[in-house]
Regions:
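A membrane-topology feature that recognizes alpha-helical transmembrane segments
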Residues: 1-152
Length: 152
């Protein structure tokens, strides 16, 4: 029962983050704080993902984001980096990379029609948080199955 409750709370928080970021291009720290608390709780409620895997998951994608920011300032916001660090703590390395892959693919699909019509430049800014949130949700529910399918 606590697993379903925690997943429900995480879904509500991720939807809230997606809506706020889509409107304001900012992810509120209060929502990230609540999500962080849920991520820590998930370590006890879902022990099948080890703590070292969770910590590595939090660090890996965040380091990728920080590297991209260092190379191209403004490419991602600090909220995106924090969101993926928390996501990694919740999902572990494999599922967090899957979430990032889903998010990147969805963002590309969203931007591609505008680029092809020349309505949108390649340099145009979009809020990436909503795509990250959808990617995280997809990874929560189907990440493990996707990884198994991809590896086979």
């Amino acid at each position: 029962m606590e697993k379903i409750f925690l997943i429900g709370v995480v879904c509500v928080i991720l939807i809230s983050i997606a809506v706020v970021d889509a409107r304001k291009k900012k992810i509120p720290n209060i929502l990230l704080g609540i999500l962080f608390f849920c991520a820590v709780l998930s370590g006890f409620i879902f022990p099948e993902i080890s703590w070292p895997d969770r910590i590595a998951g939090g660090i890996l994608v965040s380091v990728v984001f920080l590297t991209v920011i260092w190379i191209r300032p403004g490419a991602f916001g600090a909220g995106d980096v924090k969101l993926m660090a928390i996501s990694g703590l919740m999902l572990g390395v494999g599922r967090n990379l899957t979430a990032f892959g889903f998010a990147t693919a969805l963002a590309a699909l969203y931007c591609l029609p505008g680029i092809l019509r020349r309505d949108r430049k390649k340099e145009s800014e979009i809020a990436f948080g909503p795509f990250l949130c959808v990617g995280i949700l997809l990874s929560i529910f189907w990440g493990k199955a996707f990884i198994r399918w991809y590896i086979s």
